[in-house]
Amino acid sequence: MKSYVFSLKDLDKTQLAVAGGKGANLGELSKIEGIQVPEGFCITTDAYVRAVESSDEFNVLVGEMSTLSAGELAKVNEMSGKIRGLIESLPIPAEIEEEITAFLEKFGEQNAYAVRSSATEEDLPTASFAGQQDTYLNIIGRDEILKHVSKCWASLFTDRAVIYRMQNQFDHRKVSLSVVIQKMVFPQASGILFTADPITMNRKITSIDASFGLGEALVSGLVNADNYKVRDGRIMDKKVSPKKLAIYALKEGGTQEKKVAAENQNRQALTDQQILELEKTGRRIEAHFGRPQDIEWCLYDHQFFIVQSRPITTLYPVPDKKDGKNHVYMSFSHQQMMTDAMKPLGLSFFQLGFQDKPEKKSEGDLFLPIGGRLYFDLAHDLSSSMGRKIVLASMGKIDPLVLNMLKSLAKRKDFLKSLSRSGKGFFSMGTGYFSWGLVVQSIKISRDNDASIVPTLMSQNEASVRELQHRMESLSGEELFAAVIRELKRMKEAVCDPKSMGAVYAGTLASSWINKNMEKWLGEKNAAGSLSKSAANNVTSEMGLELLDVADVVRQSPAVMEYLGHAKDQTFFEDLEGLEGGDAVSKSIQAYLEKYGMRCPGEIDITRPRFSEQPTALVPSILSNIKNFEPGAHNTRAEQGQLETKRKEQDLLNRLEQLPGGKQKAKKVREKISVLRNFIGYREYPKYLMVRYYWIIKQALLREADKLVQKGVIREKEDIYYLSFEELREAVRANRVDYGIITERKAEYEAYAKLTPPRVMTSEGEALSGEYDTGNIPKGALAGIPASSGTVEGRARVVLKIEDAHMEDGDILVTTFTDPSWTPVFVSIKSLVAEVGGMMTHGSVIAREYGLPAVVGVENATKLIKDGQRIRVNGTEAYVEILSQE
């Protein structure tokens, strides 16, 4: 005979499908020596299925629910209410009722019990569904307990549970629910313990929230809780809150709010000794589960009882370093304006391209993959006084928030003493990744100011790309993978060539010099931005302007314009050929893709779909260009930019000449402007070169993926994205792969994609915080980094994906980050606000090139600014004001 009810002691963490997350975890907790768990039993998920499976009405309603989306709140509310009502009205099958009754007799039918929901998708390692279903406390009597079992089953369809499943792509028909019934504990105090600080994410700090009575008062937000921080067995901080209310159990069943006696309201809920004892309990539980835990506890008769433990799913991962030293990890992804999670092949491929000896099969350690993003370790740089000075000076020009974080860290003497000194520094001149040769080249190039250097460098690299294309076309198997290693070495040499990087730095140093001295002499901030418009040899700004030419071809064909509104990538060019004017449009777009088709959002990740793979991503920008610009706008905008730059240059020179020593100042500024104009555009080229290498190699790897699909090694060619480069190499060699790894990596990637990567974190897991200096900005304004000067007002368009960027003339783009692929969108907008970026990141450079006021590094901009609101962007003083709430 099938059993529907089990004692908690008979369950463990492997029985998620039977007992749900809460039941499985409680069963596992009961097996840890020294951990007290209230006695109880679990009604399995099979019991829920048995109770609802015979109801045709239930199946119909759940089917209808599955057709709704999370945004249809009224319909979700109505449908979920019907399902709950139906479940509560269904009789509990007799065999299940008998088993429940038997367990109640065993534990004492007249005892008070807590009746808790335990869903199968609850408290997973990668997602926490805490609070999505219901809990009922102090339930007494068999009939009441049975009634509340049905209520728990019904709570699988609360509005919040349904919407959460919709948002996280869980199927309503594939989730089920068990019910945990435990003897009530009537606590003097209760609360929540986090074995890692939920605010800073520091794994060394335990954070305890505590209040009087039952924990439901705390969880529901009814009362303020005490908070205690413990590190290494020492209480490091205590915040004792006034606790005016508490929830207590009633003898006859149910609960009641009570006022706390005045003399006890400001008393610690736990003594210091109890705090330290509870911290040890938390660490024991964490050690058992092998990861940080969110633990619900209660104190009764001087003894701690644990009523739940679940993984903390919001913590950002930390590298597992075994050296016993401190490390400091700075996000490279933020500097690249690409904070989305990357897939394993993308991470390992990028690492491989920038390690010292890519011919070795070990993948590089300059860039560390953490939580699906790229970080580099600053420990070596920060371990010395000189190194800290170099890092802080460098970050002052890149990201003020990171600068403030590192300044704060530099004050922690004990932390600095234990920093790792192994490996290379990232910023350390001569010993790290910045060479004296680069300094010499940039000085020489600035002094000579030879405008022919950049076209010569570009011509040489174009030839190398053509040769690469030819070499890769005929390669396959191990021969291909060996060639990829060689080509990545060539790519690194080309991208990091001292002469090439010297040209980049010549432009950026000229920009810094102009900004510094124009503010000093004329009180004008960020003047270089106004002098960078229509600069020569800027492949990224040209990418945006050349899409205007494509729009001019498209606008001549109404049939094509209509088709673009519903175009599909798979048949894009085939469909165009069948339309009037489609042949000309097809040739125009294909010519554009020949130059720029290797670009895409997040292009440093080789796995991301390129414009050549997903041409419809360009459609919104093409249609916006047709709507917002007259024919021939490319040349008009380029000429206008050059004219505005000339006017700005002359204005500055005229004003300088009025100053003491003005003629000499004006002469020097004229020279620096010439250097700026000759070299600032080239700053975009090295990355363009890199992604061209990426695209050629990606096409070769996808040819290998097609072969693996044909042989049945993988199911779809995109599966290779979830293998590292070396794993893919081995799969091709052996014609074999453990598909379980791919499945596991896909789940891991989805979990990483939901995390917010910190700009800077320590090896203890602490996410450092930093703030802008907001002293000179209007009250309530959002602070950021000045990326491009000027002040404008307009309608905010909050856009998270380039394919959703349907912009109108005068709109202000508000987004998380922009990389070069977003440049076509910049043509139509009035201004830019981005959550991520710095003065010299791509979005900032192109904003200056196009003359768009821009503020970047505005934290949570896409959440604080609503789509359609009218906002003011001050790119000079680096703030954004929300002017209307509509």
Give residue spans per PLM region.
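Accessory helical subdomains and C-terminal extensions of nucleic-acid helicases
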Residues: 104-113, 645-661, 665-669
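Glycine-rich beta-alpha junction loops
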Residues: 117-121, 131, 185, 210-214, ...
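Conserved divalent-metal-coordinating catalytic cores
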Residues: 1-35, 39, 43-45, 52, ...
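Amphipathic alpha-helical segments within well-ordered protein domains
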Residues: 84, 133, 656-657, 705-706
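Core structural elements
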Residues: 106-107, 111-127, 300, 304-307, ...
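Short, compositionally biased low-complexity segments
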Residues: 52-80, 119-129, 235-260, 641-651, ...
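Extended, domain-scale alpha-helical bundle/helix-rich regions
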Residues: 123, 672-759
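N-terminal beta-alpha lobe that positions the nucleotide/phosphoryl donor
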Residues: 1-180, 189, 265-273, 278-287, ...
